[in-house]
A protein has these predicted regions:
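Small-molecule-sensing regulatory modules
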Residues: 67, 71-188
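Residues within well-ordered alpha-helices
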Residues: 2-3, 21, 64, 88
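Alpha-to-beta junction loops
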Residues: 8-17, 21, 94-106
């Protein structure tokens, strides 16, 4: 909200957001210029090294919870987890609050995390764990009149894919806390 106010009042020209966290409808006077080239959209299953078959998986995401229960581990116990990435990894590795969690690969990469003591990282194929709409994409939010000015900074392939994913989400009446996964690759 703070960034949007800064844009509308002319104190900022561009606001940078994680696309998956944006509402499907922009506030009046604002628009999306598009998206920077998308990072790998897969989720990563992060499990303790000493666990062969997880009994408790921690995630705050309704989408991840629904997919894990429906396809991978229907009998596992799900637990809420909060905090930044480092905190979540410590809660699994050190505090043993759960056997595993699921995190976005793009987030781990942007933080420079490819390993963590006591944990193994297993990227999940997109067809097994469908990402959130806009996952791994960075959105550029601007004032409505500035679309042409900033559109050239955006990646057309990512913009086409994420616009489609967000349209599907909007059609379903969803937001970032809904158990909806959608991912577009290539031309339709």
């Amino acid at each position: 909200k703070e960034l949007e106010v800064a844009l509308l009042e002319g104190h900022a020209d561009v606001a940078v957001h994680s696309a998956k966290d944006l509402p499907t409808e922009m506030p009046e006077g604002l628009a999306l210029a598009g998206y920077l080239p998308r990072e790998d959209p897969r989720d990563v299953f992060v499990v303790r090294d000493d666990v062969a078959c997880p009994k408790v998986i921690a995630t705050g995401s309704p989408r991840r919870r629904a997919q894990l229960l429906a396809t991978h581990w229907p009998d596992v116990q799900m637990k809420e987890i909060r905090g930044n990435v480092g905190t979540r990894l410590r809660k699994i590795s050190v505090d043993h609050e759960a056997d595993a969690t699921v995190l976005a690969l793009a987030g781990l990469r942007r933080l420079g995390i490819s390993e963590f003591p006591g944990l193994r990282f297993e990227p999940l194929p997109v067809h097994e764990m469908v990402p959130a709409p806009g996952q791994a994409a960075i959105a550029l939010q601007i004032r409505e009149g500035d679309v042409e000015r900033y559109g050239a900074a955006c990646d057309s392939i990512t913009t086409s894919a994420v616009d489609f994913e967000r349209a599907v989400l909007a059609t379903m009446g969803g937001g970032c806390q809904v158990a909806v996964g959608v991912h577009r690759e290539g031309d339709i």
